Amino acid sequence: MNRGIPFRHLLLVLQLALLPAVTQGKKVVLGKKGDTVELTCNASQKKNTQFHWKNSDQIKILGIQGSFLTKGPSKLSDRADSRKSLWDQGCFSMIIKNLKIEDSNTYICEVENEKEEVELLVFGLTANSDTHLLEGQSLTLTLESPPGSSPSVKCRSPGGKNIQGGRTLSVPQLERQDSGTWTCTVSQDQKTVEFKIDIVVLAFQKASSTVYKKEGEQVEFSFPLAFTLEKLTGSGELWWQAERASSSKSWITFDLKNKEVSVKRVTQDPKLQMGKKLPLHLTLPQALPQYAGSGNLTLALDAKTGKLHQEVNLVVMRATQFQENLTCEVWGPTSPKLTLSLKLENKGTTVSKQAKAVWVLNPEAGMWQCLLSDSGQVLLESNIKVVPTWPTPVQPMALIVLGGVAGLLLFTGLGIFFCVRCRHRRRQAERMSQIKRLLSEKKTCQCPHWFQKTCSPI
């Protein structure tokens, strides 16, 4: 019995010695679809020696015969290679190009009667739709993975947005700051592989902008895009809602072709001017109160569903003096937090309100400033000069004028009255003289009827 135990041990040692190679621990390598991976295999001695790479089905992929690289009948024969320059250093790695998901397998390197097993897991991460998406659209990323794997994915946008999940990741509402290179990390068996995905969010650089102008100044509207494309074609329109108007109207329509802009239609009031090159640029000749309001510029790109939008606001300021009233007004969309002020330069006289109009009665002479401010920051300023007025005896002068007019009218009336009276007396005297002359000639009336017609009582 005691002699049998050493014999069994000896038999086990002989069986181990007869094994062609010793298998080392399996390594796990993660690869990316379409990329290149290098599976390492190192000999204990730094010299050129025989080696072979096989898959899990023991099909030869490549190896060395003499000093030449030979390839087997595997499906990787046209994509597998080895670094010949490193053979003398005992490095017999296998390089696989243009990785595919089905390349995921266990690969065996046989060198110096030893075996090294490398498990290759190939993953692919792609966007389900076009990587050029309009602002507000959804982004979906899908992970391709080999059967039997259970990876996790974490992605980070250029704007710092983090999403994570399994084989599908979704971003419901893309924002303009999401445009750029997304970094996604796939984890499996405590190993990681990193993907870079370029996402282009089609949007304007700003969602909204406000232009502040004094009455009569020229207005410039600019709509820069947050992306660049080699070929950019589409059409656009600017709708405007003036503060004083009951409804909005189209101010201008245009076409965009190969980054060149051509105007299709423009209103006559106001008559906008548009630049012919990007960025989109509009000029309003004069800022007037009737133009103050809000506009919405839309841009529809060819082969894309939906439109790009940018809101633009125009605020117009007017400072006027009428009789004894100095007024400062603004028109257009303003925040209730904004402050409107009238301030006399170099003096402490100031009138401020969170309103769209302020005024001063009987203002002092000097340069007045009309200011629109936001938390102390001046957004718009207009100056108006008030000249000094000297007091004049307005009432006595008026009385003198009125008295003169009344006297003239009275004198004229008396003159007319006396002229008429004098004329009447003259006619009466002429008639009396005629009667006396007739009587003196002893001409009397022959009948009462003639007397009544020709004679008048004395």
Curated annotation (Swiss-Prot):
One GO BP annotation of this record: cell adhesion
Domain Ig-like V-type: from-to ranges: 26-125
Superkingdom: Eukaryota
Protein location: Cell membrane
InterPro entries: CD4, CD4-extracel, Ig-like_dom, Ig-like_dom_sf, Ig-like_fold, Ig_C2-set, Ig_sub, Ig_sub2
The keyword Disulfide bond appears for this protein: yes
Gene3D superfamilies according to UniProt: Immunoglobulins, transmembrane domain of human cd4
Disulfide bonds: C41-C109, C155-C184, C328-C370
Signal sequence region: 1-25
GO cellular component: cell surface; plasma membrane
Protein task: Integral membrane glycoprotein that plays an essential role in the immune response and serves multiple functions in responses against both external and internal offenses. In T-cells, functions primarily as a coreceptor for MHC class II molecule:peptide complex. The antigens presented by class II peptides are derived from extracellular proteins while class I peptides are derived from cytosolic proteins. Interacts simultaneously with the T-cell receptor (TCR) and the MHC class II presented by antigen presenting cells (APCs).
Domain notes: The Ig-like V-type domain mediates the interaction with MHCII.
Subunit (UniProt): Forms disulfide-linked homodimers at the cell surface. Interacts with LCK. Interacts with PTK2/FAK1. Binds to P4HB/PDI. Interacts with IL16; this interaction induces a CD4-dependent signaling in lymphocytes. Interacts (via Ig-like V-type domain) with MHCII alpha chain (via alpha-2 domain) and beta chain (via beta-2 domain); this interaction increases the affinity of TCR for peptide-MHCII. CD4 oligomerization via Ig-like C2-type 2 and 3 domains appears to be required for stable binding to MHCII and adhesion between T cells and APCs.
The protein's name: T-cell surface glycoprotein CD4
Gene expressing this chain: CD4
